[in-house]
Every structure is written in structure tokens, then in C-alpha cells.
């Protein structure tokens, strides 16, 4: 069964993100076979063609992405923002740490990290995760799946729900070193990108061919 996702509240998305033309749309598509089958957030352009978090030609401006989503909420599940080398914006992804029904954290360690970091914080589409948009001088991704912590400076897009918890995008670069565990592995974000076969997507869905770059959280 297709998972439920939170609707997008465009009014609460920070202007610091809206004014940057690095937006995509995304749709939940079931990929894989048998026990490996899972729902994946595949990026798309407003015309329905595949988008890539490493190809600026497939990105668009905020208003175009918003219009495409609002005009066809069945085709698109939401919108997303791409991180790149153009600026110092980074994304912090905290997995399985939040209960949207009680509007509270379920992981004390990740809650402490989130409340200590200056940035715009919102609930993920699933309602169980938290994303933070901030600024930092970071060259590589830092990933610790055991702790549910991922930090990306480029080559990724984050879904954006506008389901704001608190905070705003800071103007100054933040020192996030204390928030990255020593065991957290540095990764080249481009190596973490993977191709997925989209042939099992819904009929008529634009993701076709042998595979398309899916770099998202």
C-alpha cells in the first residue's frame, strides 16, 4: 500500500529557500522486486520528466514547482530543494525520531542535536523524521545510519513539506562539528547516488528507460 505523506504548506517555507531556483518535484514510486521492493522518492521536473540532483538543467524555480504540484497533486507527491556548491546551504536529515500525532521527538539524542542547531526545522513527508536547513562549511556528506543522522552539502535534494517546527535559515555559517559523531562516516555524496529501475512505476508515469539518477532524502 502506498504510504501516506504530509501535504505541502507553501506559506511557511522560508524565503531564503524560495528565492533560489533549485527546486524539483517528487513522486512516490515503488521500485525493486519481491522482498527488495520499496517506495522511493523519485525527483521530477514540472513537465513530468526525470530530474537529477546533480543536473541543474532539470531544476526549476519555486513558483513553477509550486504551480506544478498544486495543478496535479495526484501526479506529484511534493516538492524538493537541491543542495549544491553554489552556496553554503546544507541539509541535516534525522530519521525515525518524531511522532507527528503528538508533535514530539521520540529520540532524545536527536532531539538534543536538533534543538542545539540553528536552522529551519520541519517534519518530513512521513511524519516520522525531521529535516534541518542551515549553513555550514562542509565538503563531504556525513552519514551514520545507526543513529539516524545524515548531513549533506551538495548532490542531494531534500523533500520540503513546510510543516515547520521552529527556526529559520541562518545568515551566518554554523559550526556543526560538535553535532557530527566521530564515528560518522564521511562520504562523497556522488558515490551515494544510485540508479534505480523505474519500469515498475505506475502506468503513464514519466520515469522510463533503464534507470534514472535518484539522489534524495
Ranges and model annotations:
Residues 184, 188-217:
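Low-complexity basic/metal-binding stretches
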Residues 1-194:
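Conserved phosphate/metal-binding and DNA-contacting active-site motifs used
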Amino acid at each position: 500500500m502506498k504510504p501516506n505523506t504530509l501535504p505541502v504548506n507553501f506559506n511557511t517555507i522560508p524565503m531564503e529557500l524560495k528565492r533560489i531556483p533549485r527546486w524539483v518535484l517528487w513522486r512516490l514510486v515503488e521500485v525493486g522486486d519481491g522482498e527488495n521492493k520499496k517506495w522511493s522518492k523519485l525527483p521530477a521536473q514540472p513537465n513530468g520528466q526525470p530530474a537529477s540532483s546533480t543536473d541543474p538543467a532539470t531544476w526549476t524555480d519555486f513558483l513553477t514547482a509550486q504551480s506544478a504540484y498544486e495543478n496535479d497533486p495526484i501526479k506529484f507527491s511534493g516538492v524538493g530543494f537541491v543542495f549544491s556548491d553554489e552556496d553554503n546551504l546544507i541539509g541535516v536529515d534525522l530519521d525515525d525520531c518524531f511522532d507527528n500525532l503528538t508533535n514530539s521527538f521520540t529520540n532524545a539524542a536527536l532531539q538534543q542535536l536538533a534543538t542545539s542547531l540553528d536552522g529551519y526545522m520541519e517534519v518530513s513527508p512521513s511524519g516520522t523524521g525531521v529535516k534541518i536547513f542551515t549553513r555550514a562549511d562542509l565538503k563531504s556528506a556525513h552519514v551514520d545510519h545507526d543513529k539516524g543522522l545524515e548531513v549533506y552539502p551538495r548532490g542531494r535534494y531534500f523533500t520540503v513539506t513546510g510543516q515547520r517546527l521552529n527556526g529559520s535559515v541562518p545568515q551566518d555559517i554554523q559550526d556543526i562539528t560538535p553535532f557530527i559523531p566521530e564515528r560518522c562516516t564521511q562520504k562523497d555524496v556522488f558515490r551515494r547516488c544510485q540508479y534505480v529501475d523505474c519500469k515498475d512505476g505506475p502506468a503513464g508515469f514519466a520515469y522510463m528507460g533503464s534507470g534514472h539518477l535518484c539522489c534524495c532524502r
